[in-house]
């Protein structure tokens, strides 16, 4: 009884499992099972998202292709316009050149020529030896046609630019008589004679025969000790003491005052390196002012000394001895100034009647007698410059007071 019970229990459990499985499968087929609801929706969502992405990519690619096509279309249109402009410019240039004798070249169909030459190579070879006269005639006609077609270039005229009204008619006075008077002389064309030129002998150049001649070195007396002392100002300074005997000094006046150095002159007879021609004295055109002469005091007084001085030529030394200059100092004569009446455009001198207060205070420090203001008498302008007294002038006196 136990095995039968076990077998029946197993059959019952198998039947229950079969019923449950069939019911689950039926619900799954009908879509009522909750386990199979999420998978199709998820797959559909994924597919939908992928389709959208692909659609966006396709739209982007289409936009790019559309832009490229538009750019290509614009480029093609621009090239067409440029081709038209170029063709118009070429036609204008051809028309302009044709006015001056330019002939455009005829286009030749190279393809047709190749076909003709390939089809009849033998016939052309046979015709050449048989008909030489025809060939010569063709060459002559071709040469004539090319000479006619190729016009000689001519110079531009006003009619080419639409300026015919500015053309000046150049008519000869008697053209027929001039033509009749001219006699045609036969031109004798002599053949060009070729002069026979002598051939130059050929010889091999040997460098051993020629020696490189270097310039001869000559000593010019230049060394590190004498390179700065060759006939320049330094040599003049060195030789000035040796040539002091030949130097002449101007006479000194008898005034025992501090003198200015005068010019040391020497005659032009010597052409030493230390002496050169002295320039002429400058002439001043200031009215009423006479430049003091650096020559002797007696030369300024005499009136005929200027003409005698121009005749005699003198030269000055480049270097003067300092000892002699200090010994021969002389007081230059004061410039002679004419009266204010003879000067041109000279203002009248101011008349000073009293000493100003500030100047009086300064003068009172040096002189106690000027304690009170003193009336100053007007002095004529002629007596402003006082003469010398005992070899001294007023300038020296004022200088002694300041000392």
Curated annotation (Swiss-Prot):
Positions of modified residues (Phosphothreonine): 190, 214, 260, 286, 346, 348
Region (Required for localization to kinetochores): 331-402
Biased composition (Basic and acidic residues): 117-138
Biased segments, Polar residues type: 148-157
GO biological process, one term: mitotic cell cycle
Region annotated Binds microtubules and contacts the microtubule-binding domain of SKA1, chain positions: 196-402
Gene3D superfamilies: 6.10.250.1400
Name of this protein: SKA complex subunit 3
């Amino acid at each position: 009884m136990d095995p039968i019970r076990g077998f029946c229990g197993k059959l019952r459990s198998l039947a229950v499992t079969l019923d449950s499985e069939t019911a689950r499968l039926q619900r799954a087929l009908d879509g009522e099972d909750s386990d199979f609801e999420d998978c199709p929706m998820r797959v559909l969502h994924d597919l939908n998202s992928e389709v959208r992405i692909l659609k966006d990519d396709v739209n982007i690619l289409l936009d790019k292709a559309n832009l490229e096509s538009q750019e290509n279309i614009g480029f093609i249109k621009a090239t067409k316009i440029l081709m038209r402009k170029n063709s118009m410019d070429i036609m204008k240039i051809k028309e302009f050149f044709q006015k001056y004798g330019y002939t455009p070249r005829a286009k030749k169909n190279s393809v047709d020529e190749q076909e003709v030459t390939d089809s009849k190579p033998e016939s052309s070879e046979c015709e050449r030896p048989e008909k030489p006269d025809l060939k010569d005639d063709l060459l002559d006609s071709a040469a004539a046609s090319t000479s006619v077609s190729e016009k000689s270039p001519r110079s531009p005229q006003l009619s080419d630019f639409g300026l015919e009204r500015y053309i000046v008619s150049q008519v000869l006075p008697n053209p027929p008589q001039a033509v009749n008077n001219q006699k045609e002389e036969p031109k004798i064309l002599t053949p060009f004679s070729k002069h026979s030129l002598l051939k130059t002998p050929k010889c091999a150049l040997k460098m051993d025969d020629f020696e490189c001649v270097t310039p001869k070195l000559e000593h010019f007396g230049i060394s590190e000790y004498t390179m700065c002392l060759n006939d320049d100002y330094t040599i003049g300074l060195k030789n000035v003491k040796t040539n002091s005997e030949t130097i002449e000094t101007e006479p000194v006046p008898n005034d025992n005052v501090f003198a200015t150095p005068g010019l040391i002159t020497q005659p032009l007879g010597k052409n030493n390196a230390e002496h050169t021609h002295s320039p002429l004295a400058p002439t001043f055109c200031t009215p009423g002012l006479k430049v003091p002469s650096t020559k002797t005091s007696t030369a300024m007084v005499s009136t005929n000394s200027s003409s005698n001085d121009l005749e005699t030529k003198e030269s000055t030394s480049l270097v003067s001895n300092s000892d002699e200059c200090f010994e021969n100092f002389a007081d230059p004569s004061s410039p002679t100034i004419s009266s204010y009446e003879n000067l041109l455009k000279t203002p009248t001198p101011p008349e000073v009647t009293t000493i100003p207060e500030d100047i009086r205070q300064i003068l009172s420090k040096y002189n106690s007698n000027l304690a009170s203001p003193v009336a100053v008498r007007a002095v004529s302008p002629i007596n402003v410059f006082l003469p010398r007294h005992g070899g001294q002038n007023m300038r020296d006196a004022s200088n002694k007071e300041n000392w």
